[in-house]
Design a protein with these regions (language model features):
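Glycine-centered coil/turn sites that cap beta-strands in beta-rich domains
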Residues: 1-23, 41-46
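Short, glycine-anchored, charge-dense loop/turn motifs used at functional sites
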Residues: 21-29, 60
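Residue-level detector of functionally pivotal "anchor" positions at catalytic/ligand-binding pockets or at interdomain
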Residues: 12, 27-29, 77-78
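Signal that preferentially marks extracellular ectodomain short beta-strand elements
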Residues: 43-55
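Surface-exposed loop/turn motifs at beta-strand-loop junctions within extracellular Ig-like
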Residues: 23, 49, 66-68
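Short hydrophobic alpha-helix segments
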Residues: 32-33
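C-terminal tail/sorting-segment detector
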Residues: 4, 36, 53, 57-79
């Protein structure tokens, strides 16, 4: 079992992408910005909040936003 989530995505351009994780109540618990290159990209979320605390079991939402398009995916954490 891993405490990490590998997030893989494709980009058409060199662009800045904002990643956010929200809890079921819509509160942002973690966020970062990443520079993306054309093609496949990936990064690892360590399963922690912005304060470095491990998040508890539950439903979360990952949002990727490049300024033109926003994608949201549901994440279920089971500890």
């Amino acid at each position: 079992m891993s405490n990490q989530l590998k997030i893989e995505y494709e980009s058409l351009f060199n662009t800045q992408i904002n990643f956010s994780i929200y809890n079921i109540n819509g509160q942002e618990i973690w966020a970062t910005e990443r520079r993306s290159r054309p093609g496949k990209n990936q990064f690892i979320w360590l399963g922690t909040s912005s304060k470095g605390r491990q998040v508890s079991s539950g439903i979360y939402f990952l949002t990727l936003d490049d300024g033109n398009k926003t994608i949201q995916e549901k994440i279920t954490i089971i500890r």
